[in-house]
């Protein structure tokens, strides 16, 4: 069996070597020649897996080690009898850590009390739902917009326009789609961006084209009261440098790049491939993850929850380093910028998640215990 895989997928040998020969190559370099004799294709979001890529090849299983599937031609897969799998939720905790770290950083820069802000979460899937749980555990005011879930469940959802009008902080966590009942391509276009309330913060850690980047540039140029945090960009790996210059924080699509999340994604695709091949899944991720540098934290039950959040979050992640590295990469010509964007992702240093922390509470505090559980950490 021949496996063609994105070279940046972690633990390829540990999970897949026993299935057959692994041929590694850059995700953006995959073409028809590369998959001409492949049985299994393993990718990330940078590879568009389409009919044009696979038609005529022997590929019968495609696994993407990512949450999203907008880079897969699922309709054609069904027609061609190609099985596929994604890794839903694999890096959700890492993205939540990124958003929380960004909020803490902006609060420090602007001298804002986070508890006094109203939060709008657009998209309540794997990432959004976890973020909502943390914000509510802190007792903060949260509004949620998710039209597909609202249509299916009813419940306490609001419209996107209400989010824009009422919320001081808006965090986007939608998939990218151009069709269907709720398309998200340019969900925030020029008209909607101009509805942002005075002093609003906009965070996009979903897909770049959920926000019209050209329109956002123009709005930020006109309105100095707004702040934007962007981890994703239209046209990646090319970045709108003028837009990046206007963002208070900018990073190269690494919000979900925690070590745990990336390796969890590989493990989920391994399990799916075992199912496809009707083989037992005998390899466990817990046996492969390295020990975290910070394993346990003690908190006094009397401490302020926001202080506790800051300690736990900063213990694993601070977005300012990634922002600085990203800005240093935005020099030179267009070709060098594109290479630098991918290099930052390929060479990304190990980053763990709050979920891996063990937290000991000295004393009793249900509020702190609820926060720790919402963050995914373990009370001991």
Curated annotation (Swiss-Prot):
<feature type="active site">
    <location>
        <position position="236"/>
    </location>
</feature>
<dbReference type="GO" id="GO:0005829">
    <property type="term" value="C:cytosol"/>
</dbReference>
<feature type="binding site">
    <location>
        <begin position="205"/>
        <end position="207"/>
    </location>
    <ligand>
        <name>NAD(+)</name>
    </ligand>
</feature>
<dbReference type="GO" id="GO:0036001">
    <property type="term" value="P:'de novo' pyridoxal 5'-phosphate biosynthetic process"/>
</dbReference>
<feature type="binding site">
    <location>
        <position position="45"/>
    </location>
    <ligand>
        <name>substrate</name>
    </ligand>
</feature>
<feature type="binding site">
    <location>
        <position position="66"/>
    </location>
    <ligand>
        <name>substrate</name>
    </ligand>
</feature>
<feature type="binding site">
    <location>
        <position position="257"/>
    </location>
    <ligand>
        <name>substrate</name>
    </ligand>
</feature>
<feature type="binding site">
    <location>
        <position position="231"/>
    </location>
    <ligand>
        <name>NAD(+)</name>
    </ligand>
</feature>
<feature type="binding site">
    <location>
        <begin position="126"/>
        <end position="127"/>
    </location>
    <ligand>
        <name>NAD(+)</name>
    </ligand>
</feature>
<feature type="active site">
    <location>
        <position position="207"/>
    </location>
</feature>
<keyword id="KW-0560">Oxidoreductase</keyword>
<dbReference type="Pfam" id="PF02826">
    <property type="entry name" value="2-Hacid_dh_C"/>
</dbReference>
<dbReference type="GO" id="GO:0046983">
    <property type="term" value="F:protein dimerization activity"/>
</dbReference>
<dbReference type="InterPro" id="IPR036291">
    <property type="entry name" value="NAD(P)-bd_dom_sf"/>
</dbReference>
<keyword id="KW-0520">NAD</keyword>
<dbReference type="InterPro" id="IPR029753">
    <property type="entry name" value="D-isomer_DH_CS"/>
</dbReference>
<dbReference type="InterPro" id="IPR024531">
    <property type="entry name" value="Erythronate-4-P_DHase_dimer"/>
</dbReference>
<feature type="active site" description="Proton donor">
    <location>
        <position position="253"/>
    </location>
</feature>
<dbReference type="Pfam" id="PF11890">
    <property type="entry name" value="DUF3410"/>
</dbReference>
<keyword id="KW-0963">Cytoplasm</keyword>
<dbReference type="InterPro" id="IPR006140">
    <property type="entry name" value="D-isomer_DH_NAD-bd"/>
</dbReference>
<protein>
    <recommendedName>
        <fullName>Erythronate-4-phosphate dehydrogenase</fullName>
        <ecNumber>1.1.1.290</ecNumber>
    </recommendedName>
</protein>
<comment type="function">
    <text>Catalyzes the oxidation of erythronate-4-phosphate to 3-hydroxy-2-oxo-4-phosphonooxybutanoate.</text>
</comment>
<keyword id="KW-0664">Pyridoxine biosynthesis</keyword>
<feature type="binding site">
    <location>
        <position position="256"/>
    </location>
    <ligand>
        <name>NAD(+)</name>
    </ligand>
</feature>
<feature type="binding site">
    <location>
        <position position="146"/>
    </location>
    <ligand>
        <name>NAD(+)</name>
    </ligand>
</feature>
<dbReference type="InterPro" id="IPR038251">
    <property type="entry name" value="PdxB_dimer_sf"/>
</dbReference>
<dbReference type="InterPro" id="IPR020921">
    <property type="entry name" value="Erythronate-4-P_DHase"/>
</dbReference>
<comment type="pathway">
    <text>Cofactor biosynthesis; pyridoxine 5'-phosphate biosynthesis; pyridoxine 5'-phosphate from D-erythrose 4-phosphate: step 2/5.</text>
</comment>
<dbReference type="GO" id="GO:0008615">
    <property type="term" value="P:pyridoxine biosynthetic process"/>
</dbReference>
<dbReference type="GO" id="GO:0033711">
    <property type="term" value="F:4-phosphoerythronate dehydrogenase activity"/>
</dbReference>
<comment type="similarity">
    <text>Belongs to the D-isomer specific 2-hydroxyacid dehydrogenase family. PdxB subfamily.</text>
</comment>
<dbReference type="Pfam" id="PF00389">
    <property type="entry name" value="2-Hacid_dh"/>
</dbReference>
<dbReference type="InterPro" id="IPR006139">
    <property type="entry name" value="D-isomer_2_OHA_DH_cat_dom"/>
</dbReference>
<feature type="binding site">
    <location>
        <position position="174"/>
    </location>
    <ligand>
        <name>NAD(+)</name>
    </ligand>
</feature>
<dbReference type="GO" id="GO:0051287">
    <property type="term" value="F:NAD binding"/>
</dbReference>
<comment type="subunit">
    <text>Homodimer.</text>
</comment>
